[in-house]
Amino acid sequence: MGIKIYRPKTSSLRYKTTLSFDELSKGNDPLKSLTKGKVSRAGRDSSGRISVRRRGGGHKRRYREIDFARRDKFGIPARVAAIEYDPNRSPNIALLVYRDGDKRYIIAPKGVKVGDILESGPNAPIKIGNALPLENIPVGKMVHNIELNIGKGGQLVRGAGGYAMIIASDGDYVTVKLPSGEMRMIFKKCIATLGEVGNEDYMNVSIGKAGKSRWLGRRPKVRGVAMNPIDHPHGGGEGKTSGGRHPVSPWGQPAKGYKTRKKNKYSDKFIVKRRNN
C-alpha cells in the first residue's frame, strides 16, 4: 500500500501523508454480523476518573470482531472475500468465507489477495496466511499473530508490518525471535499464522497536523516544565527553567531507562534473550 502526499494548498497539508488504500476492496461495508458498537471511554475508568491521560474525542468507530484463534475451523478451506479497513488497529483485515458458509475476520497478512484460499490446522499447507501449530512450522519461517496460551488466540505480533521468526524447536517448546529482539520459548501446540502482517507502510505515515491527531482521539500533551509545581515535579520556576532534576513522570517515577518489569516474573524462565533496549 503506497503513501499519498498532498500539494501544500494549506500549511497543514505540507507535511501530511496518508495511505493510498489501493489494496482495499471497493464498495465493501463491514459485515454487520461481525461488528458491534464501541463506546469511547475518553481515558476514564469505571468511576469516571482519568486513568489514561490525553484521550478523548475522535471519530465514532464500530468494533470489528477478529478471529485471532482460528481453532474451530481446522481443515475447512476459506476464500478471502475482501480486504477491509479497520479503524481499531494498524493492519487491514481480511474477510474469510469458509466452505461451510461461516464468515470471519482475520488480520490481513502481507501478500494475501481477494480470491486466495486459506486454511488452518496442523495439516494446512505451508503458505502465507495459513495458521498452524508452531511445531508444524519449519525453522526460519516468518510468523505473526502468535498464541501464548493454547486456545486463547494470537496475542503477539499483531501490528502492521510486524513479523517474528522461528529460530529453533526443542522438546515441548519452540524458540521464536520477536520484533523487539527478544527470543522467547513458546509451547509447540500454540497457533501462529505464516507470513508478515500487512499494511507495512503504516509506520511511514506522517500525521502532519494537530487536527488529525484529534480525529484519532488523541488530545494535546502538555510538558511538565510548562506546568505549575502542584501539577508536576518539573513545574514552576522563574521564567523558562529546565525542571531542575532528572526526568520523571507526574508521580515521580524516573522516565529514562528505569526498569519497570518485576524482578521475579513467572515468565522469565521462557525468555532466552532479553529484548534490544
Swiss-Prot record:
Pfam families: Ribosomal_L2, Ribosomal_L2_C. One of its GO terms (cellular component) is large ribosomal subunit. Coiled coil: none annotated. Residues 32-58, 225-277 are annotated as: Disordered. InterPro entries: NA-bd_OB-fold (IPR012340), Rib_uL2_dom2 (IPR014722), Ribosomal_uL2 (IPR002171), Ribosomal_uL2_bac/org-type (IPR005880), Ribosomal_uL2_C (IPR022669), Ribosomal_uL2_CS (IPR022671), Ribosomal_uL2_dom3 (IPR014726), Ribosomal_uL2_RNA-bd_dom (IPR022666). Gene3D superfamilies: 2.30.30.30, Nucleic acid-binding proteins, Ribosomal protein L2, domain 3. One of its GO terms (molecular function) is structural constituent of ribosome. GO terms for biological process: cytoplasmic translation. Keywords: Ribonucleoprotein, Ribosomal protein, RNA-binding, rRNA-binding. One of the primary rRNA binding proteins. Required for association of the 30S and 50S subunits to form the 70S ribosome, for tRNA binding and peptide bond formation. It has been suggested to have peptidyltransferase activity; this is somewhat controversial. Makes several contacts with the 16S rRNA in the 70S ribosome. Belongs to the universal ribosomal protein uL2 family. PANTHER family: LARGE RIBOSOMAL SUBUNIT PROTEIN UL2M, RIBOSOMAL PROTEIN L2. Part of the 50S ribosomal subunit. Forms a bridge to the 30S subunit in the 70S ribosome. This is Large ribosomal subunit protein uL2. It comes from Borrelia recurrentis (strain A1). The lineage of its organism: Bacteria, Pseudomonadati, Spirochaetota, Spirochaetia, Spirochaetales. The gene is rplB.
